[in-house]
Design a protein with these regions (language model features):
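Ligand-binding cleft/hinge of the Venus flytrap
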Residues: 77-81, 92-101, 180-200, 228-233
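Extracytoplasmic small-molecule ligand-binding "clamshell" domains
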Residues: 30-128
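Flexible hinge/capping segments at coil-to-helix
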Residues: 154-172
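Bacterial lipoprotein signal-peptidase II cleavage site
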Residues: 5, 18-35, 40
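Periplasmic-binding protein-like
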Residues: 147-154, 221-222, 229-267, 288-295
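Short helices/loops that flank or line small-molecule/ion binding pockets
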Residues: 97-98, 106-107, 111-124, 138-140, ...
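Ligand-binding clefts/hinges and TM-proximal coupling segments of bilobed small-molecule sensing domains
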Residues: 46-54, 180-199, 235-240, 267-295
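A ligand-binding cleft/hinge motif common to bilobed small-molecule-binding domains
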Residues: 112, 129-137, 184-187, 210-211, ...
C-alpha cells in the first residue's frame, strides 16, 4: 500500500514538472514572438521615418534610386519600341550615374505620390512635379530645373467660343486629380465655379476633351505642347493662347528632412548644368524655352 502511494506521489510530481515545463516553454515562445513583432515594428518604423541626412545611406546600401513617375510626354513615356524614355528619364539616369547608384522607375498614382514616397516604395517623385508651399510641408525639393505654366486645351472647333478666361464660364473642366492643373482651376475665379472632372493622369485629360466629356482641359504647358497638334493623336486640339494659369517650377520631390540626398542630387544637377548635358537634354525633348537655367 505504501509502495503504491509513493508511486502515485512520484507520478504526480513528474506530471507536475512536465506541465510546468510545458507552460514555461509556451510562455517563453509567446514572449519571443511578441518581442519579434516589436522588433519588426521598430524596424519598419525606422525604415519609414526619414531623419535628417538618413536616407542617403539607405539608398547607397541598396544601390538603387527609385523615381516615382507617371507617363507624361516628353518627361517619361514609352517609345515605339516599348522603351521608357523622355527628358526626365534620361535626366534621372544621368544624375544616378553621377551618384554611383542605379536608376529605377516605378509608375505611381499621382494623387498617392506622397504616400508612396513616405512608404519608401519610391525614393523621389521625379515627374514634372510642381513646387508649391503646400507640398513643401510634406516633402523636400531639389533645385528647380523647368519653368512651366498651366494652360487650357480645347477642341479646334471651339476656338471662337473660348478665347479668354471669362468666355469659359460654365464649361466643364478636366484636370489630373491632385495636380497643379486642379489647383489652378480651384484658384481661378471663373473656372472654380465650373463642373470639375478629375482624371487619373494628365494624358487622360486630353482624352476627356477629345471625346467631349469635358469642354476644357487644364494641364502642364510642357505636356500640352508635346502632345497636341499636327502629327499627333490630338491634332483636333489646341492651346488657348493668352490664357495662362499659375506659373510654376518643376523640381524633384524627396522625403522631408533628407538633406544629404538633396545635397548630393543638387550637386549632380550642377555638374550636368556645367558640362552642358542637361541643356542638351532639354533641347532634345523640345524644352529649351522652359529650361530653368537659361530662363
Amino acid at each position: 500500500m505504501k509502495i503504491k502511494r509513493i508511486a502515485a506521489m512520484l507520478l504526480a510530481g513528474i506530471m507536475s514538472v512536465g506541465l510546468c515545463s510545458c507552460a514555461s516553454t509556451n510562455s517563453s515562445s509567446d514572449s519571443f514572438s511578441a518581442a519579434d513583432v516589436k522588433t519588426a515594428e521598430a524596424s519598419n518604423s525606422d525604415d519609414n521615418t526619414s531623419t535628417e541626412g538618413g536616407d542617403w545611406q539607405y539608398i547607397a546600401d541598396k544601390g538603387t534610386f527609385v523615381a516615382g513617375i507617371t507617363l507624361f510626354e516628353p518627361m517619361n513615356y514609352y517609345d515605339e519600341n516599348g522603351e521608357l524614355t523622355g527628358f526626365e528619364t534620361e535626366f534621372t539616369k544621368a544624375v544616378c550615374e553621377k551618384l554611383g547608384v542605379e536608376a529605377k522607375f516605378q509608375e505611381i498614382e499621382w494623387d498617392k505620390k506622397e504616400i508612396e514616397l513616405n512608404a519608401k516604395t519610391i525614393d523621389a517623385i521625379w515627374n514634372g512635379l510642381t513646387v508649391t508651399e503646400e507640398r513643401k510641408e510634406n516633402m523636400a525639393f531639389s533645385e528647380s530645373y523647368v519653368r512651366n505654366k498651366q494652360v487650357v486645351v480645347i477642341k479646334v472647333d471651339n476656338k471662337d467660343k473660348y478665347t479668354d478666361e471669362a468666355s469659359m464660364a460654365g464649361a466643364s473642366c478636366a484636370a489630373e486629380s491632385g495636380s497643379a492643373g486642379q489647383s489652378a482651376i480651384e484658384a481661378s475665379e471663373v473656372l472654380s465655379k465650373n463642373e470639375f472632372i478629375g482624371s487619373s493622369a494628365q494624358k487622360d485629360v486630353l482624352l476627356e476633351v477629345k471625346s467631349g466629356t469635358a469642354e476644357l482641359g487644364v494641364l502642364d504647358y510642357v505636356m500640352a505642347k508635346a502632345s497636341i497638334g499636327e502629327g499627333t493623336d490630338y491634332s483636333d486640339l489646341m492651346i488657348v493662347e493668352g490664357v495662362e494659369l499659375a506659373p510654376e517650377e518643376y523640381a524633384i520631390g524627396m522625403r522631408k528632412g533628407d538633406t544629404e540626398t538633396i545635397e548630393k542630387v543638387n550637386g549632380a544637377i550642377d555638374e550636368l548644368v556645367a558640362d552642358g548635358t542637361l541643356k542638351a537634354l532639354a533641347e532634345k525633348y523640345g524644352l529649351a524655352d522652359v529650361y530653368a537655367f537659361d530662363n
